[in-house]
Amino acid sequence: MSYLPTSSEADKDLDEMTFSEKMVFHCKREPLVPAGVLMTTGAILLAIKNVRSGNRRNAQKWFRWRVGLQTGTLVALIAGSFFYGSAKHEQLSKEEQLRQKAKMREQLWIQELERRDLEVRRRKQRAEEARKKAAEMQSELSGLEQELRELEESRRK
């Protein structure tokens, strides 16, 4: 079963890692590849040992094993590249979704600010209209009071 790197390992940029950290990172990410390399190396060493001892049959057997193990290693490498390539694509897609979500939040915030601004302008307009109406009523009241005084004076006379 493959081991997926933790978020702290994934966050660390490969350019910032040392050689040994990169080796450990990639071995954890694709454990079948180093296992295939080790088994292929073992098959080559056994084939060389059998060639030196003159045992052609076993040497041929181990060379065949080497070819099979190399093929398995390449398949694991390609499968891992495909898997992590699609995972990287998904991560980019998630980043794009996060950008779109942030943009949508920004648009909603702008709309909310515009709505509040419009509401404030309407309140100011209503307040101004109320002041004008109050001023009109005050002037009308003053006019009526003046008329009432005139009527009272004319009545007294």
Curated annotation (Swiss-Prot):
Residue ranges, annotated region (Disordered): 120-157
Compositionally biased tracts (Basic and acidic residues): 120-135, 146-157
Biased composition (Low complexity): 136-145
A GO CC annotation given for this chain: mitochondrial inner membrane
Presence of keyword Mitochondrion: yes
Keywords, comma-separated and alphabetical: Coiled coil, Membrane, Mitochondrion, Transmembrane, Transmembrane helix
Pfam families xrefs: HIG_1_N (PF04588)
Listed InterPro entries: Hypoxia_induced_domain (IPR007667), RCF1 (IPR050355)
Domain of life where this protein originates: Eukaryota
Domain HIG1, residue spans: 4-95
Principal location: mitochondrion
The name this protein goes by in its record: Respiratory supercomplex factor 1, mitochondrial
Organism, as annotated: Eremothecium gossypii (strain ATCC 10895 / CBS 109.51 / FGSC 9923 / NRRL Y-1056) (Yeast)
